[in-house]
Swiss-Prot record:
The lineage of its organism: Bacteria, Pseudomonadati, Pseudomonadota, Gammaproteobacteria, Pseudomonadales. It is found in: Secreted. This is Uncharacterized protein PA14_33160. GO terms for cellular component: extracellular region. Keywords: Secreted, Signal. It comes from Pseudomonas aeruginosa (strain UCBPP-PA14). Residues 1-19 form the signal peptide.
Length: 89
């Protein structure tokens, strides 16, 4: 009985920690995008790609505001990949 209670408690605490990490990743990715776009003149991303990145950033902020952490992480990761791939060219 005690073992079962401890396992349930551990599972609940683990889920809470994972949710916090996801929220942190969402915020961290948004901050990276803000930083990169602030110095956009120093990057090789221009035109339509910048527009796409800004649209993904806006979507991520909406997802974050509505509590959709997974959507936020997906959008910010896509935007960061666009910026990273543009830097390789």
């Amino acid at each position: 009985m005690i073992v079962r209670t401890l396992l349930i408690a551990a599972a609940l605490l683990g889920g809470t920690a994972q949710a916090a990490e996801s929220t942190d990743l969402c915020g961290a990715n948004l901050q990276k995008l803000d930083d990169i776009l602030a110095v956009r003149g120093k990057t090789s991303v221009t035109g339509a790609r910048v527009t796409e990145v800004k649209e993904l950033q806006a979507k991520a902020r909406q997802d974050q505001a509505s509590g959709d952490t997974k959507g936020c992480i997906t959008a910010t990761t896509q935007a960061l990949q666009i910026l990273q791939n543009a830097g390789k060219k």
